[in-house]
């Protein structure tokens, strides 16, 4: 890349801050309680539902089989499968407390299509945003939820971005609204890897990115 006169927007260390979920320690008060080893789940939580995933990826479209666990016993079975998964296993399997989110519909495999949004940031400045679930069938509830997201959700995401902008320049904040009306961080992603999900206009996104980087589009 350097030989081409270019540079990475995020360094390897900055990428690892996202990929290893080091961000969790900076945002633990605004996201789901998370345990990086299943054995660390406290006994007080072992009768409750958990969500299992890799540090970066998940099998969310196999929700009932490989992500949602009704209790610790079910989580242990799913963890075995995920540890043997070629994509998830090398990342390390984590467990998160299941918090019911505002849900618009479900897929055939049980995946909840929730009130979740993706926001891109560069150096703490908001670039673009859109609804997270590009595969939703009925957009009506999304449009009903949009005003509250743009008023409350974006303000919440901006606050989150301000807290971690010194750690990584280009990143995505995925946020969702719980059934009780609270906004939470679902996860962070490296902006160089995160998809536009069919809900963020590519031309507008790359124009904004180019402007903020001070570099013309090739």
What kind of region is each of these model predictions?
Residues 1-115, 133-136, 142-158:
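Active-site nucleotide/adenylate-binding loops and adjacent lid/helix of ATP-dependent enzymes
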Residues 2, 16, 65, 91, ...:
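Residue-identity detector for glutamine
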Residues 9-11, 35-38, 78-81, 121-124, ...:
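Short, surface-exposed, polar/charged, turn-prone segments marking secondary-structure boundaries
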Residues 151, 166-168, 177-218:
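C-terminal active-site "lid" helix and adjoining low-complexity regulatory extension at the edge
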């Amino acid at each position: 890349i350097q030989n081409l006169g270019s540079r990475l927007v995020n360094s390897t260390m900055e990428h690892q801050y996202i990929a290893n979920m080091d961000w969790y320690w900076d945002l633990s008060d605004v996201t789901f309680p998370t345990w990086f080893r299943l054995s660390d789940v406290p006994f007080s939580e072992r009768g409750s539902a958990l969500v299992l995933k890799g540090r970066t990826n998940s099998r969310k479209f196999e929700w009932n089989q490989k992500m949602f666990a009704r209790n610790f016993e079910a989580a242990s079975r799913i963890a075995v499968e995920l540890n043997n998964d070629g994509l998830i296993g090398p990342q390390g399997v984590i467990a998160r407390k299941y918090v019911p989110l505002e849900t618009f519909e479900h897929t055939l495999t049980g995946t909840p299509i929730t009130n979740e949004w993706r926001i891109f940031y560069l150096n703490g400045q908001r670039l673009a945003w859109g609804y997270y679930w590009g595969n939703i069938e009925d957009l009506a509830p999304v449009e009903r939820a949009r005003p509250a997201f743009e008023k409350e959700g974006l303000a919440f995401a901006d606050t989150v971005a301000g807290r971690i902008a010194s750690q990584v320049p280009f990143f995505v904040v995925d946020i969702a609204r719980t059934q009780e009306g609270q906004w939470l961080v679902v996860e962070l992603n490296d902006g160089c890897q995160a998809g536009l999900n069919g809900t963020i206009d590519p031309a507008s996104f790359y124009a904004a990115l180019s402007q903020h980087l001070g570099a013309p589009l090739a």
